[in-house]
């Protein structure tokens, strides 16, 4: 198939490269000309194991099936599907800022000649597809093409930084949200993901669009909840003399619980969990459903991030004339992403405390 991926960040570049590895013809689109030029020259803007090799092989000096362009107009008439993989940062009130997603939708509406699928790959709140469809329809109306047929779908990503390539090529599940009547869009997704479903058709989960949008937020919020829960258990274990690693092993052998996401630490960070928990809390608030559990999860995580500083102060008796090494600043192994990383909170707090203690 021929597809376009708008946005070349973690999600967009990994998605585009892996689709190309599967044999699809892929155009990766980004308005950042410097980034596109670097990609054409084999310079990958992010670190992700296995990604550089795939990009270089599929791009093949411009002769492969992976292409890099600056505007959707350079490929819109060659593709049947356009994926929006641009950022959805948290707004001041915690909601997801959709300006980049809607900008892509606007450009799609300005260019499409119809019978194409617009896919939101970015993590977006429930109701985004309706907004996207409205923007596209408005642009088509301006062009006098208000009868043009197109489809809007949701295909959330489930990629973990540090193992994103593996996650894409060996997915636990593939979630696609399409309207019941959009049989053509559904058929295109079935064709696109066929290599993953040959032996396991149930791996492709097709839902209505709002459910697909909610699945991603609910999944990430559930994982964040497990992290905060185990951090609270670890803190209590420390007070009562229990060993949290032994507790974790005892819990994880219960098939209903499992071993994953039971490791205590200094809180979750990165580009997804903090943003998605905030967005789901805001969605609940806007719809009269206060998300009390997630509000507590967020508060526990905030406190957990500063716990290393308190522990260190206690062990060292203060920071006066102490040299402290922070080993690793990314929010997790096998990535260079420091967004919302606990290390940044501790470094800032340490510098402030060092000044108060009289050290330089």
Map each language-model feature to its residues.
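Structural/interface elements that position substrates and couple domains in central-metabolism enzymes
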Residues: 1-360
